[in-house]
Regions:
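Chalcogenol-based redox active-site neighborhoods
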Residues: 1-164
Length: 164
């Protein structure tokens, strides 16, 4: 994992208005992705989920998939991230026909940067979504461990307001 010169490691929870740390991670195909490159094509909805192939994470990820046309209409991109391996992300993608990148943050470095890595919990990261504008500032932070649809639904609401 790498971060750029104006993104320093920050273990505090990232908040609305903060500059989102840039990073480089491999996706489910083994291709390297950076936040800054993805932002060239529009806002990014970056959602952290605890573990691929689990019931709640599958529901959340599939809801993001099912709303693909709405995200596309707003010129935004969806980007999932967990501490699973590239192979596990590939399996999760194939099993659920996901149409967006899933990043493998195996060591939890990016989760630490965004302040969502748990220290002693079975769930490795806090289920959190960051809506990031093209200027790399966080437009909104969405938290919910119980309502899986909230993440995609609220992200769309934020993106609509940004576009208005």
């Amino acid at each position: 994992m790498e971060w750029d010169s104006d993104s320093t490691p920050n273990l505090a929870f990232m908040q609305k208005g903060d500059l989102a740390p840039d990073f480089k991670l491999k996706d489910q195909n083994g291709d390297e992705r950076t936040l800054s490159t993805m932002l060239l094509n529009g806002p990014v909805v970056l959602f952290f989920y605890p573990a691929a192939m689990t019931k709640a994470c599958t529901k959340e990820s599939c809801h993001f998939r099912d709303l693909a046309s709405e995200f596309a209409a707003l010129g935004s991109q969806r980007l999932g991230i967990s501490m699973d391996s590239v192979a596990k992300q590939a399996e999760f993608t194939a099993k659920n026909d996901l149409d967006y990148p899933l990043l493998a943050d195996v060591n939890g470095d990016v989760a630490k940067l965004y302040g969502v890595k748990r220290s002693l919990d079975l769930l490795k990261v806090k289920r959190t979504t960051f809506v990031i504008g093209q200027d790399r500032h966080i437009a909104e932070v969405i938290n919910s461990e119980v309502s899986m649809n909230t993440h995609a639904d609220k992200s769309l609401d934020v993106l609509r307001k940004l576009k208005a």
